[in-house]
């Protein structure tokens, strides 16, 4: 029965393909006939499924048949009242959450380490941000989650806060206390929005933390492509309850969605939903088991520290995210990531002291076991060449910032570039992040300080890529023109 779960859009696309219709319509490559030879060879028969928006296949802007049914099935699968497909990734879904929940000038309470895409939503919506500093985990040198006490205090002090945004789980798999926070938000008549980019697999097994929807969130943005079987840039926005206007959410999603959505991308969302609907529990178990093999491998090396739930201050951990700290061996995360890449293993994230491996249900093949063997070979070599331990410096923690101007105001202000060292005391005119994880170090409108410059220089020296500024080398930074 599981294999007979409906995939409405895919079934409609296959039906259209079987009719052998000659396409005197877009796209211009005409079912692959005109596509560059090498690309066509690599893509294979799938190019015939790259079809145009037409009534036979439904319209994501006005869904009435196959897309409507597929999105309804996704909502049923996750237990929401409505699901909206996002073909511009979770960034689009986050923007839609903010524009649905808040009007211009209203306040959003959020952690300062929210993903950089949130800043774009604040600009689009003219929303005022009220930031909270997440708790810090000194042994791994990473930011964790904001607490219910912080949120309770902020909501009690400012009745103009209309919504709260969480990132849960965070990049490292640490889940916030979403249920308690949801209760707190609703008691203060605020809606709870969750960036659940790294949690589309939650809610299908007790081996993992519960999902945001199960914990009472009003909406969540999920990266179906990050953890499940959808193609890159495919995500979902889930909405539940009466606190958000579903029609407004639909209108916002339509505004933010291209009028030429790729049907292969949407088909992959349909397929990923069907897969997790049928096998979600088995997929979760497979991922947890595969991650456990990697955890055991790394933990067997003296000095390496693998993040466990006990390191999370009472919060739950998605154990399919495997964070390994190499400070005791004297290696930075960047260096270790490069060593693994030389051994033909690419990791999800590196930072000053850690490497993050992302394990999913797909890591059950002999290829995965071979990758584990290559990881072990690298670790054996590193163990024989251990260095003096690294001291987890305070510089590992992003310095606190001070907002001087609203993001939207800065977006429309004139800016000029100055050498980074000369920007102290100036108002930043652009976003500065190191990606991944894409957490802004500086946001437009914030004051540039010596501490922030020192932090940025330290991250550059580690070799972490800069994201956001016009000058990607960060030799210069744009500030508000005097």
Predicted segments, located by residue:
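N-terminal "arm"/small-domain region of PLP-dependent enzymes with the aminotransferase-like
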Residues: 1-65, 437
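Conserved PLP-enzyme active-site core in the AAT-like
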Residues: 9-14, 20, 38-40, 62, ...
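Conserved N-terminal alpha-helix of the aminotransferase class I/II PLP-enzyme fold
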Residues: 47-90
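A generic structural motif
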Residues: 170, 328, 361-365
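Short hydrophobic/aromatic beta-strand micro-patches
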Residues: 238, 325, 358-360
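Short acidic (Asp/Glu) and glycine-rich catalytic loops that position anionic groups and cofactors
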Residues: 246-250, 268-277, 315-320, 349-355, ...
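Conserved small-domain helix->loop->beta segment predominantly found in fold-type I
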Residues: 282-356, 383-399
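PLP-dependent enzyme catalytic core of the Aspartate aminotransferase-like
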Residues: 342, 348-482
């Amino acid at each position: 029965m599981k294999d007979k779960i409906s995939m409405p859009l895919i079934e409609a696309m296959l039906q259209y393909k079987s009719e052998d219709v000659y396409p005197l319509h877009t796209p211009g490559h005409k079912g692959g006939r005109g596509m560059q030879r090498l690309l066509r060879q690599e893509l294979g028969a799938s190019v015939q499924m790259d079809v145009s928006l037409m009534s036979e296949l439904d319209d994501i802007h006005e869904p009435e048949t196959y897309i409507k049914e597929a999105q309804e099935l996704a909502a049923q699968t996750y237990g929401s009242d409505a699901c909206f497909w996002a073909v511009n990734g979770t960034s689009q879904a986050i923007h839609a959450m903010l524009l649905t929940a808040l009007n211009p000038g209203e306040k959003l309470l959020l952690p300062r380490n929210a993903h950089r895409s949130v800043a774009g939503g604040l600009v689009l919506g003219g929303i005022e941000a009220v930031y909270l500093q997440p708790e810090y985990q000194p042994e791994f040198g990473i930011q964790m989650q904001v607490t219910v006490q912080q949120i309770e205090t902020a909501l009690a002090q400012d009745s103009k806060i209309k919504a709260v945004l969480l990132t849960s789980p965070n990049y490292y798999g640490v889940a916030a206390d979403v249920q308690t926070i949801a209760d707190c938000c609703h008691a203060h008549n605020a809606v709870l929005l969750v960036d659940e980019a790294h949690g589309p697999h939650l809610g299908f097994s007790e081996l993992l933390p519960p999902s945001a929807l199960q914990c009472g969130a009003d909406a969540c943005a999920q990266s179906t492509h990050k953890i499940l079987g959808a193609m890159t840039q495919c995500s979902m926005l889930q909405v539940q309850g009466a606190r958000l206007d579903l029609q407004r959410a639909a209108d916002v999603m339509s505004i933010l969605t291209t009028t030429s959505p790729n049907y292969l991308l949407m088909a992959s969302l349909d397929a990923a939903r069907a897969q997790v609907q049928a096998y979600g529990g088995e997929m979760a178990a497979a991922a947890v088991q595969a991650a456990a093999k990697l955890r055991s491998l790394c933990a067997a090396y003296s000095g390496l520290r693998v993040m466990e739930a006990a390191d999370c201050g009472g919060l739950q951990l998605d154990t399919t995210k495997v964070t390994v700290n190499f400070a005791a061996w004297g290696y930075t995360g960047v260096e270790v990531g490069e060593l693994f890449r030389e051994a033909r293993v690419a990791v999800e994230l590196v930072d000053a002291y850690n490497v993050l491996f992302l394990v999913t249900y797909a890591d059950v093949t002999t290829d995965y076991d071979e990758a584990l063997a290559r990881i072990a070979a690298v670790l054996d070599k590193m163990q024989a060449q251990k260095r003096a331990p690294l001291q987890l410096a305070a510089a590992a923690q992003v310095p606190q910032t001070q907002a001087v101007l609203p993001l939207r105001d800065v977006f429309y202000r004139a800016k000029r570039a100055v050498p980074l060292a000369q920007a102290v005391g100036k108002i930043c005119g652009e976003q500065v992040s190191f990606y991944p994880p894409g957490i802004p170090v500086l946001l437009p409108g914030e004051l540039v300080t010596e501490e922030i410059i020192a932090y940025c220089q330290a991250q550059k020296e580690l070799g972490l890529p800069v994201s956001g500024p016009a000058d990607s080398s960060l030799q210069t930074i744009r500030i508000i023109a005097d």
